A protein has these predicted regions:
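Interfacial loop/beta elements and low-complexity acidic/Ser/Thr-rich segments
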Residues: 1-319
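Primarily a LysM-type cell-wall glycan-binding module
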Residues: 311-350, 355-370
């Protein structure tokens, strides 16, 4: 059993947006929002023929199946997912010889997802979770047909990049104020990646490989650590050794792809498009794979924001002059200066003809009162 479990909790909260007589400082952030997650399924029932009139199926030796996402499209409240599948079946015929047949088919599913939009992004993982294969008699009453029944599990995440505004500071002039705050963990400054990639992995065996009977490769799991996309590739195959014995091989290797030089966290999905192999020598196989991947890199950030503000007492500032000289430091915020003088930051900016909220050099400011 190999399980990868992601748990998401939807949190509803509120942020102070306006208050009479209060000045509110907002901070805008680009945020990766995971709008929906879920698992759907696609059932299939395929019947196909061997295409060889002189051959009947005695028994089925092994079955592999590949499944890849060929297309995906989001419209309002729905997502279309198209899947391409390939069955590889090794069987024994009536004369006792083994043979192999491959069969390709396509299927699709429309998934209902509330509140998703065409501008959203999707990360999809599709894999066969149930498969039952059996020989079946054809119209001539011969065991020359195969029926494959199964289910494909389609897990998905729907994401969007949104600009969110957070109230991070507030005050009411001439009053001592108390702010109620809360904290929220956000995925800020997201970077979107979508691309295709071909690469090669080498697998070594401790026995000689004379002939590959059947081979299968799968992407087992995907994660992002320090801006590096990691995917575990499982290779498994049946082969004949030097003594013509049927043997089984299974091994997992990790493929890593650096997405960014800045270390960030991320979400990703990998779709295996196709693969082939070359026997390098009697005990080594080079597996060549083509994938496409979807990834988001982001910075985990805990932001403290204001939910409410209240006054405690009125300040005794009756003797405060209408215009005050203030020696501002480099990189000091006009907002912080206005808050300390219980005035409006816009008055300071206009009075001193400033172009930014941050003071770029040490200077004298005229601070108007209110």
């Amino acid at each position: 059993l190999n399980a990868q479990i992601n748990v998401f909790c939807k949190r509803c909260t509120h942020c102070l947006s306006s208050c009479e007589n209060a000045f509110i400082k907002n901070r805008e952030k680009n945020v990766l929002n995971i709008k929906a997650t879920g698992v759907s399924s696609v059932d299939f029932d395929e019947v196909f023929s061997l295409g060889k009139n002189d051959s009947q199926i005695k028994n089925i030796i092994n079955t592999y199946i590949d499944c890849s996402v060929s297309d995906k499209k989001i419209i309002k409240d729905k997502m279309l997912v198209k899947l391409d599948c390939e069955l590889s079946i090794v069987y024994c015929n009536e004369s006792g010889k083994s043979d192999k047949i491959k069969y390709n088919f396509s299927t699709s599913r429309i998934i209902d997802i509330a509140n998703c939009l065409e501008t959203d992004y999707s990360i999809i993982d599709a894999r066969v979770c149930q498969l039952y294969v059996k020989p079946k008699v054809n119209n001539d009453n011969k065991l020359c047909d195969i029926e494959a029944v199964g289910r494909i599990a389609v897990s998905y995440k729907i994401c969007s990049i949104e600009k969110e505004s957070f109230s991070v500071d507030s005050y009411i002039p001439h009053f001592k104020t108390i702010s109620q705050t809360d904290k929220l963990s956000i995925k800020s400054n997201p970077i979107y990646y979508y691309d295709s990639k071909s690469f090669e992995l080498t697998f070594e065996n401790d026995k000689s490989i004379v002939e590959i009977v059947d081979l299968n490769a799968q992407i087992l799991k995907v994660n992002v650590v320090s801006s590096t996309l990691n995917c575990a590739v499982l290779l498994r195959f049946f082969y004949l050794d030097e003594g013509s014995q049927l043997c089984y091989y299974e091994k997992e290797e990790i493929y890593s792809l650096k997405l960014n030089d800045i270390e960030m966290n991320g979400e990703a999905g990998v779709n295996l498009l196709n693969y082939d192999f070359v026997i390098n020598n009697t005990s080594k196989i080079n597996l060549r794979l083509s994938i496409d991947y979807t990834a988001f890199l982001y910075q985990e950030e805990n932001i403290e924001y204001i939910t409410d503000i209240s006054t405690e007492e009125m300040l005794d500032d009756s003797n405060t002059p209408q215009l005050t000289l203030y020696f501002a430091k480099k990189n000091e915020s006009v907002w912080d200066i206005a808050k300390s003088f219980s005035t409006d930051s816009k008055l300071i900016i206009d009075e001193n003809e400033l172009t930014s909220d941050i003071i770029d050099t040490r200077r004298v400011l005229l601070v108007p009162g209110m």
